[in-house]
Amino acid sequence: MRSEHFVNNRNCSLLTALSPNKKDMTKEELKKYLPHREPMLLVDEINIDENKVVHSKYHVTGEEFFLKGHFPGQPTVPGVILCEIMGQSCALLILDDLKDKITLYTGIDNVRFKQQVVPGDTIEVEATLSNQRANMYFCEAKATVNGKLCAKGSLSFALIEDQRNK
């Protein structure tokens, strides 16, 4: 890892794998970067803006496995799933570094859940990279539904070699 890969909110110097003309990705394109597959691929689409902020969406259909028993008669997306959605979005902040590597989460701090997420909702995540040291990355993420905050937190992850294809 090169030393110029240090980032903070004011000076994001990490590059992404996206060209200046390709900042939007579909779920199928995301599979090139994330190791997750259905039913655990929890990002439907993303956009990385000019400030290196990830904007992602996940559409809650009501058919998800995690809604089956949480809660009968009143299905609600579990908080841990909201964390996973934010986590997958954070990994997309470092697309350029994901080649032959995967992210393993090392911490989720200061997470707060503010409102329920139910079938029919579209979860929108905004994630930023706040710091990086060696192979460790630190992010801030918030999830909203219809502009209302439903979850927020600080996430950290390590970037490791992808052993699946070796």
Where are these regions (language model features)?
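Active-site helix/loop of acyl-thioester processing domains in fatty-acid/polyketide metabolism
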Residues: 46, 77-100
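Short Pro/Gly-enriched beta-strand edge/turn motifs at strand-loop
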Residues: 24-30, 121-125
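Cationic, low-complexity basic patches in intrinsically disordered or flexible, solvent-exposed regions
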Residues: 5
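Hydrophobic beta-strand-centered segment that forms part of the acyl-chain substrate-binding groove
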Residues: 89-124, 150-158
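Short aromatic-glycine motifs in intrinsically disordered, low-complexity regions
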Residues: 27-37, 99
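Catalytic strand-loop segment that frames the active site of acyl-thioester-processing enzymes
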Residues: 38-77
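HotDog/MaoC-like acyl-thioester-processing domains
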Residues: 51-55, 117-121, 128-166
